[in-house]
Regions:
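PLP-dependent amino-acid enzyme catalytic core
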Residues: 3-4, 10-341
Length: 341
């Protein structure tokens, strides 16, 4: 699948912060081309899907779980490190995450030869903690995600490290836009895209690229009821913070939306739908049964929406889903499924 035409520039330019163009996306693709995977798509044509999917015309799933570091997060993390100065690279980067962003920053830092510290909650899946260690990052274990963000801020202040935010900022949105551009370019027939929403880093970029390339396409976001910060933000007309988060999908468990990604979502996303945790559990099983993949809850969210609240919208349409990532241990995978309500 051909990338969008782009210049050979190896560094990101200075852009208007609230605008992303096709030229911006194609330039980012050039930067990422040598280090990332242009992930495959799988068409939902197998007879095994019969009786599961609504009456769609056709569909494809973009398999970002096969990306470097196991998720789409590698795109934005690598762009983020590439855009900092050489002086900043010498001081290193720091991130706070219990999810896929932790592994993505550790991977991107190793690739760029930059020191990385990752603040992670103690309850983080051991696979992710060990993965960060294996990539050469220093892991700081914290009480919870709030403590992890506090440690990240302290580390940045004390050591001069550059913060790599898990979803807010141009590099994260632009990285995800390269994913959206790949998908819509490979499958121009798709007219309805369903994309998981955590903090908004994935959908803000994918929706922007999709609408730039195929403006008539419909973009639907999906959030758990227990972590619906973007749904509530759009309802309020501004980025909001939730009082609490309660979902099995830790990768979608952001307690807040933030202004940068929220603004792109407001402009380019047609609707946000919500799903229950058990909807994701069922779709995790479906992915295992049909595609033989071990999908974490967030990875199964788009499928859960398609067979749930989006099923009527999808009738007669070509549908695109994204399997956004899957860094989950088998122990945690089975524990989540066994806890089904």
């Amino acid at each position: 699948m051909a990338l969008l035409a782009a210049s050979k520039s190896s560094t990101l330019k200075v852009y208007k912060m609230n605008s992303i163009s096709l030229s911006d996306i194609s330039e980012a693709q050039v930067i990422l081309k040598e280090v990332l995977v242009e992930t495959p798509t799988v068409q939902m044509k197998s007879d095994r899907w019969e009786g599961i999917l609504p009456d769609i015309k056709g569909g494809a799933i973009k398999m970002e779980l096969f990306q470097q570091a196991g998720s789409f997060k590698a795109r934005g993390a690598y762009l983020g490190i590439q855009q900092i100065s050489e002086r900043e690279k010498l001081k290193g980067v720091v991130a706070a995450s219990g999810g896929n962003h932790a592994l993505a920053v550790a991977w991107a830092a190793k690739k760029a030869g930059v020191s990385a510290k990752i603040a992670m909650p103690k309850a983080t899946d051991e696979m992710r903690i060990n993965g960060c260690h294996a990539l050469g990052a220093e892991v700081i274990l914290c009480r919870d995600i709030a403590d992890a963000f506090s440690k990240m801020e302290t580390c940045a202040s004390d050591e001069g490290r550059t913060i790599m935010h898990p979803f807010e900022g141009r590099h994260m949105t632009l990285g995800s836009a390269t994913c959206g551009a790949e998908f819509v370019t490979a499958h121009p027939e798709i007219d309805l895209f369903i994309i998981p929403v955590g903090g908004g880093g994935l959908i803000s970029g994918m929706a922007t690229a999709i609408k730039l390339i195929k403006s008539e396409a419909i973009v639907i976001g999906v959030e758990p009821y227990g972590a619906d910060s973007m749904f509530q933000s759009l309802k309020a007309g501004t980025a909001v913070k939730l009082d609490k988060v309660n979902t099995i999908a830790d990768s979608l468990g952001s307690p807040l939306a933030m202004p940068y990604s929220y603004e792109f979502v407001r402009r380019h996303v047609d609707q946000i739908l919500r799903i229950e945790d058990d909807d994701m559990r069922r779709s995790m099983r479906t992915y295992q049964d049909i595609l033989k993949i071990t999908a974490e809850p967030a990875c199964a969210a788009a499928l859960a929406a398609l067979v749930g609240p989006a099923k009527d919208l999808a009738i007669g349409k070509q549908v695109g889903l994204i399997a956004c990532g899957s860094n989950i241990s088998l122990d945690r995978y089975h524990a989540i499924l066994d806890a089904s309500g």
